[in-house]
Amino acid sequence: MKIKLVTVGKLKEKYLIQGINEYLKRLNSYAKMEIIEVPDEKAPEKLSDAEMLQVKEKEGQRILGKINDNEYVFVLAINGKQLSSEEFSKEIEQLGISGKSNLTFVIGGSLGLSDSVLQRSNQQISFGRLTYPHQLMRLVLVEQIYRGFRIMKGEPYHK
């Protein structure tokens, strides 16, 4: 299985990079995973609704440029479906069984995702109604993907 994570912005925090790299190393025995960072759109602190929409659209076009037609796309969205770790694992397993072996996960920028990215997605998922820094969500998502494979293979993992 090939897994791609498309994110907006460059990760700068060393502790997050180290955590992500640790889980990527652990994931190697289950799946090939790559992380693609697209540039975030520079914008002033205060934006009008039209300017926010424009920023999301520009970032959205960059995201869509990294997604292929044959990929099953999950986007992280606050209003997405909430899954337990076991349900998430089952979802990935079922996709693999049905022949969908190219999975892409998308984490938007600080303003969220454009409508065009949401429309391209096959599934919107959420890690709850709380708001998290999008950089931190990279680590959380990669850990959950790793956890999902451990669960799928019947291997022990902390609950």
Curated annotation (Swiss-Prot):
A GO MF label: rRNA (pseudouridine-N3-)-methyltransferase activity
Known catalytic reactions: pseudouridine(1915) in 23S rRNA + S-adenosyl-L-methionine = N(3)-methylpseudouridine(1915) in 23S rRNA + S-adenosyl-L-homocysteine + H(+)
Gene3D superfamilies in the record: 3.40.1280.10
Any single GO CC term annotated in Swiss-Prot or TrEMBL for this entry: cytoplasm
Organism superkingdom: Bacteria
InterPro entries hit by this protein: Alpha/beta_knot_MTases, RlmH-like, tRNA_m1G_MTases_N
Binding-site list for S-adenosyl-L-methionine: L76, G108, F127, G128, R129, L130, T131, Y132
UniProt-listed Pfam families: SPOUT_MTase
Record PANTHER family: METHYLTRANSFERASE (PTHR33603), RIBOSOMAL RNA LARGE SUBUNIT METHYLTRANSFERASE H (PTHR33603:SF1)
HAMAP family, alphabetized: 23SrRNA_methyltr_H
Function noted in UniProt: Specifically methylates the pseudouridine at position 1915 (m3Psi1915) in 23S rRNA.
Subunit composition and interactions: Homodimer.
Protein name stated in the entry: Ribosomal RNA large subunit methyltransferase H
